[in-house]
C-alpha cells in the first residue's frame, strides 16, 4: 500500500530552504509506485497540530516548482515550537493519530538544531510505540552550526551575501579621507561562521574589513579600543565586523552592556545591539565618525545574491532524505561529507539525529589568528567553494519572480 509524505519547515528561513522542499517534492513525485501524495505542513508542527496542511503534489505544477527552488524564505511558513521532553505527554498520541489519518509513511522536517530535536523526539516515540512512520531531518541554517556535517544548506548563500555586502560597504567607506569607523554586526549567537565570511570581501591582503571578531574568542573592550586605534593609524577608513554574540571573558554578551537580552521559546537569548554598543564606545573614546550597520534578516532572505552551489546542494539534501526514508532509514539527518581532493565534491550521507540535536558546531579556534582579530587561510579553502555559482532566475519588470503561498 502506498504511503504519503509530509514535509515541514521550521526555525529561521534561508535563501535556499525552499530548494530542499523542492527536492523532497520532486523525489516524491518521481516515485509514484511508492508515494501517494506529498503534503506540506503550514507553519511546521505547530500548524499541523491545528490541522493546517496542503497537498503540494496536487497544488504545484512544474513551472511553479522551478520558481519555488529559487524562492527565499519558507514557502510553507515556519514556527518555533518546542516538543515536550516527556515522551509520555499527550501531545504525541495526538500528532501520531493525525499522521495516521493522512496515511503518512515518511516525515521530513527541514530545519536547524531545534528542528533536529523535533525529529529526534518523534522518531524515538515512533520506535517505542511500534509506529512504522520514518522520520528524517533535512539540515538548514545560515549559522552553519550543526555537527556531523561539513556545512549546512543556507550557509553558502548567506556567506556570499555577507561577503558581497561587506565589500560594498568597504567601498562606500573608502570615499572620504576623514577618519571613520564602520561596524557591521552579523548574525551568530555562539558560532562565528557568518562573521568569518566577511573576510571573503577582501580583494587583497590589507583590505577591509581590518578587524573581525567572533564569539569563539573572548572580547575585551579595552583591547578593542587599541585595535581600532592601530587600524585608524594604518588607514583613515576602518570596517569592523562583529558577531551579534560576542562576549567577554565572563560570558556576558557585549549587547547586554547596553540592555538585558530577552529569550525565545527554546531559551536562547535574542541578541542584537552589539554594534550599537561598540559604536557608542568608540565615538566616546576617540571622537571620530562611527556608524554601525546591522545586516539582520537580509543575511537569510536575500534571493538575489545566492550561491548556485548552495541551491543545488539544498535540493540534493531533500532528494537524499526521500531516498534514505524509502530505504528504511529513520531518526536520521542528511549530512554533507566533503571528499578529499583538490576539486570540491561532496556526498550526502545519513547521521544519527540523536547525536546532532542540541549540539553546536563552533568555528574552529585554530582558524582564528592569535590576536583574535582575523581569520586564517584555512577558512578561505573551506568557504570559497560554497559561495560559487550564480543562479539564473526568472525576472519580471526588473524584479525577481518568487512563489507565494495562497
Where are these regions (language model features)?
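Glycine-rich oxoanion-binding loops at beta->alpha junctions
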Residues: 51-105, 114, 153-155, 167
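Short, ordered loop/turn segments at secondary-structure junctions
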Residues: 10-12, 41-46, 80-81, 112-113, ...
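N-terminal phosphate-binding or glycine-rich loops at protein starts, especially the Walker A/P-loop
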Residues: 1-53
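C-terminal non-catalytic interaction/assembly regions of soluble proteins
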Residues: 255-406
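Accessory alpha-helical/coil subdomains and C-terminal extensions
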Residues: 98, 106-111, 117-129, 136, ...
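Gly-rich Lys/Arg/Thr-decorated short loops/hinges at beta-loop-alpha junctions or inter-strand turns
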Residues: 4-8, 68-81, 140-150, 177-180, ...
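Short glycine/serine/threonine-rich phosphate/pyrophosphate-binding segments
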Residues: 14-24, 48-49, 84, 92-93, ...
